[in-house]
Amino acid sequence: MVLGGCPVSYLLLCGQAALLLGNLLLLHCVSRSHSFNATAELDLTPSGAAHLEGPAASSWEYSDPNSPVILCSYLPDEFVDCDAPVDHVGNATAYQELGYGCLKFGGQAYSDVEHTAVQCRALEGIECASPRTFLRKNKPCIKYTGHYFITTLLYSFFLGCFGVDRFCLGHTGTAVGKLLTLGGLGIWWFVDLILLITGGLMPSDGSNWCTVY
């Protein structure tokens, strides 16, 4: 069949070729658009913060104080994980080399307790400006090792003549002496009760009493 001097089959073939060419051009434009959008998403991070690649994908490089992304060191305590204070066991040289840590633990009054910086890190999934690991200052040099004041006081009152209270607190040497003398014939037993109540007798490892809520 001839239409306007051209076979119909030839016209259909030309139409299919034009349609195929149009589809190819459309696919090419769509792929270029997706590539541009992906690049734009990497560039358009929050103002003043550049996203870091690699395992710390939730870290940002801090560059603008007006940015909505804050430094990891400004996060509240519930969003960070901190190590326990470093115990230098009275080694002043090690303390000076490291720059932080505790020479001694514990204390009855606030003024008696040392304060130091500890290593902290932002929790996984929390977005903040790097570095994600930082020092957080003014942490008290206090540790808890399972000693309860009420329990120790009861031990001292009922079994103090046998040195159970001092055994419990880790004062093994004096506990043996207290046991052999049956609490110093009652005098040592009474003195230890007073020392416990006034805070003069504490765990030997420098830990504080555990708090009961």
Swiss-Prot record:
Signal peptide bounds: 1-22
Membrane topology classification: Multi-pass membrane protein
Domain TM2, chain residue ranges per copy: 146-194
Residue spans, topological domain Extracellular: 23-143, 203-213
Keyword ATP-binding: no
A Pfam cross-reference name: TM2
Record's protein name: TM2 domain-containing protein 2
Any GO CC annotation of this UniProt entry: membrane
Family to which the UniProt record says this protein belongs: Belongs to the TM2 family.
Cytoplasmic side: 165-181
